UniProtKB/Swiss-Prot annotation:
One of its GO terms (molecular function) is tRNA binding. Gene3D superfamilies: Ribosomal protein S10 domain. The gene is rps10. SMART domains: Ribosomal_S10. Belongs to the universal ribosomal protein uS10 family. Signal peptide: none annotated. Involved in the binding of tRNA to the ribosomes. GO terms for cellular component: chloroplast; ribonucleoprotein complex; ribosome. This is Small ribosomal subunit protein uS10c. It comes from the Eukaryota. Pfam families: Ribosomal_S10. Keywords: Chloroplast, Plastid, Ribonucleoprotein, Ribosomal protein.
């Protein structure tokens, strides 16, 4: 498998917990640096907030409500000039289950 010099790998990471997301980014950057690839990032993207409004009372009292929110943290990592060793190392990398990963070549 030959990869030209102009290719790059873009990795998008999403998680509800920012600490797990940052440790996953560190693992990816460490793997890229061990295989002599040039890594740019992690670039933080805006955090998405989803707010849910729920009535506290099961019957009446419409004025009493609770608000719950879910924050979705996102990061982007670009890897320039990846080798086949870099791709193999990224495929074998174990990341936590709370992190959603999207890889584009």
């Amino acid at each position: 498998m030959t990869i030209t010099q102009q290719t790059k790998i873009r990795i998008k990471l999403k998680a509800y917990n920012s600490i797990i997301l940052n440790t996953s980014c560190d693992k990816i950057l460490d793997t890229a640096s061990r295989t002599n690839a040039v890594a740019v990032g992690p670039i933080p993207l805006p955090t998405k907030r989803r707010i849910y409004c729920v009535l506290r009372s099961p019957h009446v009292d419409k004025d009493s409500r609770e608000h719950f929110e879910i924050r979705s943290h996102r990061r982007i990592i670009d890897i320039h000039q990846p080798s086949s060793q870099t791709i193999d190392a990224l495929m074998k990398l174990n990341l936590p289950s709370g992190v959603d990963i999207e890889v584009k070549l």
